[in-house]
């Protein structure tokens, strides 16, 4: 005999009962969600303050009265669309308005809105509402600018000690930067026929124009010498052991030379001026041995042209690149790191003093340090290919001394 399922077993509930129960649960959960999403209540309202129109929970001061969102919206729509002349009441305007009955009689609800003091003249039409919103946005933007100016005013400028350091670094750069501010007048353009006829094939598919490569090697030795002279003029660098000085110089040399070329990018002729004297186009530098490194330096030059860097900012960038404590084989890592931090802090304070108009200027400028480090790493890899493909006699001794045995 088949046993009937027990009515106490929850699994044996009739299907329609389970469906109704599920519906009730969904409705209950929806109510919980709705209640948890209730709007912001201003601090000037007492706890559980009621709407003066219907008695529901008030959300703020609307049209001169404390009301709920529902009555606020009803009153606004009525005035904006001029609906009140169309309202009527089945009970001679004697309805009691509360949160249950408020939607049953529009006329009595509107009359109560007026009787409790809601002001019709405070309801804006579409054009006034747009104008008000625009005014709010303008005020917001004005406050934002005022706060930004205030924050800029409170950013520290360099201290007396930092100004002294900044002066030393700037002079070190100026005295070792070929042609100085007169580079445009003194530069000579590399003839266009040089660097356009690649001869030696490189392993990565690029080719080297040996004539262009030969031209570049003529200016590389004095360019390297000037970077070394710049470093020696910095007191913090001179205090380091010779072994660390050599590692730091080998690590930063290409980065600093690239920076010095990049800040001499000319958008009109689309050239970089190398070592303050030789203006070259992108393809010439690329075919002359640098390959994709050429693209990176030109791209850096184009982006830096918007920064309008002065000599001091270029000098401090070089000092930060020089004092990189993550170079392999260093002895005085902590000391070098502290030196770089000193330069960075003076640099940041100088940026505050300069008051550039570019938003977030300081972090954007620091990103260029990363770009220059990447250029240095790419050149180290490229140098290995050049050594294989180009005749050894074309490499100046100082060029080999600096770039050989670099970590790739």
From Swiss-Prot:
Main location: nucleus
Binding site for 3,3',5-triiodo-L-thyronine: 226, 275
Superkingdom in the source lineage: Eukaryota
Sequence ranges assigned to domain NR LBD in this UniProt record: 161-405
Pfam families: Hormone_recep (PF00104), zf-C4 (PF00105)
Biological processes annotated in GO: cell differentiation; mRNA transcription by RNA polymerase II; negative regulation of RNA polymerase II transcription preinitiation complex assembly; negative regulation of transcription by RNA polymerase II; positive regulation of thyroid hormone receptor signaling pathway; positive regulation of transcription by RNA polymerase II; retinoic acid receptor signaling pathway; thyroid hormone receptor signaling pathway
Alphabetized UniProt keyword annotations: DNA-binding, Metal-binding, Nucleus, Phosphoprotein, Proto-oncogene, Receptor, Transcription, Transcription regulation, Zinc, Zinc-finger
Positions annotated as zinc finger (NR C4-type): 51-71, 89-113
Subcellular location: Nucleus
Segments for region (Disordered): 1-22
Binding site for Zn(2+) 1: 51, 54, 68, 71
First and last residue of the signal peptide: none
Positions that bind Zn(2+) 2: 89, 95, 105, 108
CDD domains, alphabetized: NR_DBD_TR, NR_LBD_TR
GO (cellular component) term, any one: nucleus
Residues where Phosphoserine is found: 12, 28
Chain segments carrying region Modulating: 1-50
Molecular function as annotated in GO: nuclear receptor activity; protein domain specific binding; RNA polymerase II cis-regulatory region sequence-specific DNA binding; sequence-specific double-stranded DNA binding; TBP-class protein binding; thyroid hormone binding; zinc ion binding
Residue ranges of the annotated DNA-binding region, renumbered to this chain: 51-125
Family: Belongs to the nuclear hormone receptor family. NR1 subfamily.
Comment text on domains: Composed of three domains: a modulating N-terminal domain, a DNA-binding domain and a C-terminal ligand-binding domain.
Function, in words: Nuclear hormone receptor that can act as a repressor or activator of transcription. High affinity receptor for thyroid hormones, including triiodothyronine and thyroxine.
PANTHER family: NUCLEAR HORMONE RECEPTOR, THYROID HORMONE RECEPTOR ALPHA
Assembly and binders: Probably interacts with SFPQ.
Stated name of the protein: Thyroid hormone receptor alpha
Species of the source: Gallus gallus
UniProt lineage: Eukaryota, Metazoa, Chordata, Craniata, Vertebrata
């Amino acid at each position: 005999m088949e046993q009937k399922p027990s009515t106490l077993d929850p699994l044996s509930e009739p299907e329609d009962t389970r469906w109704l129960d599920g519906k009730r649960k969904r409705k209950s959960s929806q109510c919980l969600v709705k209640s948890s999403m209730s709007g912001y209540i201003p601090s000037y309202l007492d706890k559980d303050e009621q709407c003066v129109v219907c008695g529901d929970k008030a959300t703020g001061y609307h049209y001169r009265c404390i009301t709920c969102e529902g009555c606020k919206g009803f009153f606004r729509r009525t005035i904006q669309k001029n609906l009140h002349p169309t309202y009527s009441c089945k009970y001679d305007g004697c309805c009691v308005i509360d949160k249950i009955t408020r939607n049953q009689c529009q006329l009595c609800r509107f009359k109560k809105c007026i009787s409790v003091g809601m002001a019709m003249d405070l309801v804006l039409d579409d054009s006034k509402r747009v104008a008000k919103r625009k005014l709010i946005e303008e005020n917001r933007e004005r406050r934002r600018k005022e706060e930004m100016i205030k924050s800029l005013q409170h950013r520290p400028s360099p201290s007396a000690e930092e100004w002294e350091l900044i002066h030393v670094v700037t002079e070190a750069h100026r005295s070792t930067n070929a042609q100085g501010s007169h580079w445009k007048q003194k530069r000579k353009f590399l003839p266009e026929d040089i660097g356009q006829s690649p001869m030696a094939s490189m392993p990565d598919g690029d080719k080297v124009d040996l004539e262009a490569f030969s031209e570049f090697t003529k200016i590389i030795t004095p360019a390297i010498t000037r970077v070394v002279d710049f470093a020696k003029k910095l007191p913090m660098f001179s205090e380091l052991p010779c072994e660390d000085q050599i590692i730091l110089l080998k690590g930063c040399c290409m980065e600093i030379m690239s920076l010095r070329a990049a800040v001499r990018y000319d958008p009109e002729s689309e050239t970089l001026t190398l070592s303050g004297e030789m203006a070259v186009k992108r393809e010439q530098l690329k075919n002359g041995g640098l390959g994709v490194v050429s693209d990176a330096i030109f791209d850096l030059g184009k982006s830096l042209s918007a920064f309008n860097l002065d000599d001091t900012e270029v000098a401090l960038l070089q000092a930060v690149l020089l004092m990189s404590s993550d170079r392999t084989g260093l002895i005085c890592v902590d000391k070098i790191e502290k030196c770089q931090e000193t330069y960075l802090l003076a640099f940041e304070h100088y940026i505050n003093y300069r008051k550039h108009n570019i938003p977030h200027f300081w972090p954007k400028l620091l990103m260029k340090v990363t770009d220059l480090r990447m250029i240095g790493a790419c050149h180290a890899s490229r140098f290995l290919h050049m050594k294989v493909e180009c005749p050894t006699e074309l490499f100046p001794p100082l060029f080999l001394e600096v770039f050989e045995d670099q970590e790739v």
